[in-house]
Amino acid sequence: MAYVLTETSAGYALLKASDKKIYKSSSLIQDLDSSDKVLKEFKIAAFSKFNSAANALEEANSIIEGKVSSQLEKLLEEIKKDKKSTLIVSETKLANAINKLGLNFNVVSDAVTLDIYRAIKEYLPELLPGMSDNDLSKMSLGLAHSIGRHKLKFSADKVDVMIIQAIALLDDLDKELNTYAMRCKEWYGWHFPELAKIVTDSVAYARIILTMGIRSKASETDLSEILPEEIEERVKTAAEVSMGTEITQTDLDNINALAEQIVEFAAYREQLSNYLSARMKAIAPNLTQLVGELVGARLIAHSGSLISLAKSPASTIQILGAEKALFRALKTKHDTPKYGLLYHASLVGQATGKNKGKIARVLAAKAAVSLRYDALAEDRDDSGDIGLESRAKVENRLSQLEGRDLRTTPKVVREAKKVEMTEARAYNADADTAKAASDSESDSDDEEEEKKEKKEKKEKKRKRDDDEDSKDSKKAKKEKKDKKEKKEKKEKKEKKEKKEKKSKKEKKEKK
């Protein structure tokens, strides 16, 4: 017998086909082109109803993942009695999972079976007694919404999409602000060129334009809210002796409009930066404590989500953002990059050139731990203690490599464990002699280490001298070889010239 397993929003339906070899039919589409033919071909053999919406969601997820649930297994055992029967299923993964159960029937899932399912889905309400088309549609819609919610796992505090969009917008704002500020300085620079050299901050420059207007009003304009007293005096002095040209009121209006845009963009950028910082502390507090808000947000945006970044190994996190350099290095067989986006982290920035790669590797390892705690820990809090501890360890490692104290992060004070009081021990006089012996042993160990270091230095020096000698000997051999080749060339040339002279002489004598 041939059975067709149909998954509906109401439950599992097991349909019995009248034709044993229906899945081998060449004219299947013509055989199942009407409801009468479908009803004639298939009869319902068993139906396992879902008890609730939660049960329906659980079963649907099992089918999507290619797993056989206990409810489905119970239904399949009903056709176990029919020997040499065939079960037609829609998914290949599900077919493989059913085969592993060891039931006594053949499981089929191929391109031909899709036509069977297409016909069954079209006339499904007629095949299931007591089920109307409207009821099935409502159930399907409810189940679709449940699956969607399950996949999204929506939580207002866990939406990393907000971080991805915020960091992308922040980068765009920075580019726009730089472009607008440059254009504003070039435009207003025709009227007051000295101002750009005195005031380097773009926002302060735009605010001065809005407050002062034309440079002739500088002396009577109060700029104390924008600039310090010394710089304000310099601006006013420069305005009196400026080399700039005069501009019309129309020009100034357009410059003011651009300056207003710069001030508004800067205010919105600051607001967006604060929003991003708050989001990062809510979603990835440990990563934020370790690498900072901006670097952490860029890592999440580059990988697509917090979960996918947490699944990445430390080696991937280390070079994330340097993919082009990595593939170019692999193609040309050169050294691979040591860091990507992590280069902009403050801890990597504190290291000198030779230690940047080592610190990037340590930082990537600690970032991987922090990310997994942020993304996957069930009982995590938003204090970021793991990130602070990891940062302290990276700073200690950096201090060891640099040979100077660079530690800035305070130690995380955790709640002390309860200590049980025991009876105090009496003074042991023998311990003094043991201590003295251990001190003498440590002194002897130090002497042995010093001897080893001296020996290693001597060996390194000898190797260096040997290398230099070998280089000199190679150079001498090369020079000797070159001289020999030159000599041989010269001899050949002389022989050739003699031969030519001789032949010329013989020709003359013949004449």
Swiss-Prot record:
Its main location: nucleus. Keywords: Coiled coil, Isopeptide bond, Nucleus, Ribonucleoprotein, Ribosome biogenesis, rRNA processing, Ubl conjugation. Residues 283-403 form the Nop domain. Residues 423-511 are annotated as: Disordered. SMART domains: NOSIC (SM00931). InterPro entries: Nop56/Nop58 (IPR045056), NOP58/56_N (IPR012974), Nop_C (IPR042239), Nop_dom (IPR002687), Nop_dom_sf (IPR036070), NOSIC (IPR012976). Disulfide bonds: none annotated. One of its GO terms (cellular component) is nucleolus. Residues 440-450 have a biased composition (Acidic residues). Gene3D superfamilies: 1.10.287.4070, Nop domain (1.10.246.90). GO terms for molecular function: snoRNA binding. It is found in: Nucleus, Nucleolus. The keyword Nuclease does not apply. There is a cross-link at K281 (Glycyl lysine isopeptide (Lys-Gly) (interchain with G-Cter in ubiquitin)). Residues 435-511 form a coiled coil. The keyword Transcription regulation does not apply. GO terms for biological process: rRNA processing. Residues 454-463, 474-511 have a biased composition (Basic residues). Belongs to the NOP5/NOP56 family. Interacts with SIK1/NOP56 and NOP1. Interacts with the trimethylguanosine synthase TGS1. Component of the ribosomal small subunit (SSU) processome composed of at least 40 protein subunits and snoRNA U3. Required for pre-18S rRNA processing. May bind microtubules. This is Nucleolar protein 58. It comes from Saccharomyces cerevisiae (strain YJM789).
